[in-house]
Structure formats: structure tokens, C-alpha cells
């Protein structure tokens, strides 16, 4: 874990995401396991979050997003590369993001994961940038963007327009996680195609294979 911490700190500093800090703030470091089995360094900002005035910008309801897809036959899914890290922190707020680790005291120059207002801030930015296409040919939830169309010709044009808009705003997508010109895609935990929404097979299997619940805490955890 220490080796992984050292590597991730080095990658963040080399990439220009963090810098050494002399800030009086010093949040602790945590490690979170990702779906692919690797670990991601996160900062425990609970103390800072408790003092933060909350940004009430609403996150969209997933069921309302899916309602927009009726009649669509072509789909493109874009995943922004390290989405939060594409937003710079205001110079006056950089010191507040400082964290301590075994290998030094650092602060973020870009928006880190774990800040209470990070989702609302990112959602607001995405809505501002993609406003011309929202609910017409695009739905977006945080760093996941779905372009949907009824014809291939319209879809190709709309994909080009969205990519150009992202380029103009200096937002980068992660190519390995993008799916272009598809008849079916996975998006926000569902399989989507021209026939509608479908529960993903692995999620159904997980529910079917769940052991019998006998305690209130087990039921609460399942829900």
C-alpha cells in the first residue's frame, strides 16, 4: 500500500494535479478499491466538508434521463478522463484541499474526489457546456455523457458537434471507455437499445445468488 501511495503521489505531482503544501489544513489519506481491483488514493475531507456551505445545484434523476431516450436507435457513450481533475481549483481555495501522507504534505491544484460540492460543481459545468444539446440528443450524469439519435446520419453529426464542443472547452474523454456509434450500450447500470432499458445480467445474477437474509442489518445492507 505504501508503494502504491508513493506511485500515485508521484503521478499526481508529475501530472500537475498536486504540489507540496505549507497549508494549515491537513486531511488524511484513504485508499478505495476500484471495480477493476486496483486502488485509488482518496482524501478524507469529512472535517472540511462539515464546514463547507453546500452547493444545492441538483443532480438529475436517472429515471427522467432515461425517459428522453424513447425512439432512439443509435448511441455513443463518452467518459471524461478523470473528470473532476479537469476543473482547476480557485487559487484562494487551494490551501483548503491540503492533505498529509507518509511522504509529505500536498495540496490539490484541481478539484479532488471527496469534496462535498464536487458533484454539484461538475454537474453545473457539464450542463453549461452541453446546454445546446441537453434533452435533445444528449443526457449527462456527472462525467458520463450519452448521445442518442433516431438515425445514423443524425447521430454522426451530433457526435461530431459534441466532441467539438468538448474540445473547445478543453475537456478530454478517455478513449478506452468510450463507445461510438453503437446500437446498444451500458449506461448508469442499465443496458440501453432501441427497445428500451434492460437490467444488466450480472446485476440480476447478484440478486438471485444473494444469501437468505435473516437479520435487520443484513436487509438494510442489501437495500
Question: Where are each of the predicted segments found?
Answer:
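Retroelement reverse transcriptase polymerase core
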Residues: 1-223
Amino acid at each position: 500500500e505504501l508503494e502504491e501511495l508513493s506511485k500515485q503521489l508521484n503521478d499526481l505531482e508529475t501530472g500537475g494535479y498536486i504540489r507540496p503544501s505549507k497549508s494549515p489544513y491537513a486531511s488524511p489519506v484513504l485508499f478505495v478499491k476500484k471495480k477493476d481491483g486496483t486502488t485509488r488514493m482518496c482524501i478524507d475531507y469529512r472535517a472540511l466538508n462539515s464546514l463547507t456551505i453546500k452547493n444545492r445545484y441538483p443532480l438529475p434523476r436517472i429515471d427522467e434521463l432515461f425517459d428522453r431516450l424513447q425512439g432512439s436507435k443509435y448511441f455513443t457513450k463518452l467518459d471524461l478522463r478523470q473528470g473532476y481533475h479537469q476543473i482547476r481549483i480557485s487559487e484562494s481555495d487551494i490551501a483548503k484541499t491540503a492533505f498529509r501522507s507518509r511522504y509529505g504534505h500536498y495540496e490539490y491544484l484541481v478539484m479532488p474526489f471527496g469534496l462535498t460540492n464536487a458533484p454539484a460543481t461538475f454537474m453545473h459545468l457539464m450542463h453549461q457546456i452541453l446546454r445546446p444539446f441537453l434533452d435533445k440528443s444528449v443526457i449527462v450524469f456527472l462525467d458520463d455523457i450519452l448521445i442518442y439519435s433516431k438515425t445514423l446520419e443524425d447521430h454522426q453529426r451530433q457526435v461530431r458537434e459534441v466532441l467539438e464542443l468538448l474540445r473547445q472547452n478543453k475537456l478530454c474523454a478517455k478513449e478506452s471507455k468510450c463507445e461510438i456509434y453503437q446500437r446498444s450500450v451500458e449506461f448508469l447500470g442499465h443496458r440501453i437499445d432501441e427497445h428500451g432499458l434492460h437490467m444488466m445480467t450480472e446485476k440480476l445474477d447478484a440478486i438471485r445468488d444473494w444469501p437468505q437474509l435473516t437479520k435487520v442489518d443484513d436487509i438494510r445492507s442489501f437495500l
